[in-house]
Each structure stands twice: as C-alpha cells, then as structure tokens.
Amino acid sequence: MISLVFVLLIGAAFATEDDKIVGGYECKAYSQTHQVSLNSGYHFCGGSLVNENWVVSAAHCYKSRVEVRLGEHNIKVTEGSEQFISSSRVIRHPNYSSYNIDNDIMLIKLSKPATLNTYVQPVALPTSCAPAGTMCTVSGWGNTMSSTADSNKLQCLNIPILSYSDCNNSYPGMITNAMFCAGYLEGGKDSCQGDSGGPVVCNGELQGVVSWGYGCAEPGNPGVYAKVCIFNDWLTSTMASY
C-alpha cells in the first residue's frame, strides 16, 4: 500500500508540473490559431481558445489570475500578432481531484473578447468522442528534452488515441472515464513539462487537454489527457452562465 501511495504521489507531482513536446516538430507558424499561452510573468501552461470570450485549459494549471497570450508562435519574441488579455474568471471543474488528476479541465473567461483574425481563431468543441486510432495534433511550448528543438517556438506532435486497454495497462487503476491516453507505447514522442493545459485536436475538434503522465516519452507510459467530449454539457452551461 505504501508503494501504491508513493506511485500516486509521483503521478501527481508530474501532473502538477507544466507539461512539453518531445520528438515533435516546430509547428508551421500560426497554424494552431487556437493555442494560447497562460502567463504569470512566465509561460506556465497552454490552453485553447474555444470562442472569443473563453479558453479551455487543465484544472491543475489553476491560478486565480492569469494573462492569456494569443496569436503567439515564438513566445520570447514580439512578432506583432500577439494579443495579451487578462482573465476575468478562472473556473475549475467542480469535481476536479488533485489526488488522481481526475476531471482535469478548467475554463478561463477573458476580460475582453479576443479579436479573431489570421492569427487567432477558436477551435470547435467535440461533437462526439473520438475513437481509438484517431490521429490528433498536440501542441505546446513545453520541455522538448532536445538540444536542437527551440521550445520558445510552438512545437507540434501527431499522436494516435490509444485504446482504453492500452491506457489502463500503462497506468493500472488510474485511468477514469474522464481521461484517455494518446501517443506511442514504444516511447520517444510525447507531451511533457510546459505543455499542460494545451490542446489535443482531432479532425478540427478539441478532444483532449494535456494533463499528466510518468516522465516524458518513456516506453510504456503514454501521455494522459482530459477527455473533453464528456465535459461538453459543463463547458456550454458554464460559459452561458457568466
């Protein structure tokens, strides 16, 4: 039992770090127009613009006030495409658990509407849950674990959604119906520290939010993502309430 508790604590420790793309590629500039950087003097998490007023991120990225940076590609350079908008509300899912990182989803209301343009566009919420085998793109400014990849420039990675059995075998007893795994069981490609809260987009829909995992790109330990499709009712009702 002690060892199990230790394993869960390690998982929580990884999950509360800011998650980065390993084994990916630099995104084509402004191809992920929904991607945002959450900033509190530094980039600490990603997020996804879902309409001009709201951003979806991970609940474990919660801070009471954040600056949302939109239209970014290189977060260390002023490129002229950026919009910096402070939050007016930050709302974690009411059933979020920091113990097992369950229901790891959060809404951020912008203090003013984002200006939609070539560099800033929302991503659609899912119309249904994507099946195993669906190819998706995860993106972020996290730790690339590479001496050559520039993590200041948005990194992308194409990953498949894994089956529940593969996911549960990787993390026995830890996967809830609010989570899914995506990536490669052989390792080498994954989201990692600095990507947390960022998007997993499949066929133009936001299916996942970068949530947790053991290490980065480790064999047998794929990335774990919040399953956005089961939160549609909460997302739409919460956005309508504020």
UniProtKB/Swiss-Prot annotation:
Site (Required for specificity): D190
Listed InterPro entries: Peptidase_S1_PA, Peptidase_S1_PA_chymotrypsin, Peptidase_S1A, Serine_Proteases_S1, Trypsin_dom, TRYPSIN_HIS, TRYPSIN_SER
Propeptide stretch(es), residue numbers: 16-20
Effect after changing T33A: In trypsins IA/IB
Disulfide bonds: C27-C156, C45-C61, C129-C229, C136-C202, C167-C181, C192-C216
Keyword set, alphabetical order: Calcium, Digestion, Disulfide bond, Hydrolase, Metal-binding, Protease, Secreted, Serine protease, Signal, Zymogen
Sample GO molecular function, one term: metal ion binding
Cofactor note: Binds 1 Ca(2+) ion per subunit.
Gene3D superfamilies with a match to the protein in the record: Trypsin-like serine proteases
GO cellular component terms given for this protein: extracellular space
Active site: H60, D104, S196
Peptidase S1 domain residues: 21-240
Residues reported to bind Ca(2+): E72, N74, V77, E82
Origin species: Salmo salar (Atlantic salmon)
Known cofactor(s): Ca(2+)
Name of this chain's protein: Trypsin-1
Family in the record: Belongs to the peptidase S1 family.
Catalytic activity, as annotated: Preferential cleavage: Arg-|-Xaa, Lys-|-Xaa
Subcellular location: Secreted, Extracellular space
Keyword check for Signal: yes
One BP term from GO: proteolysis
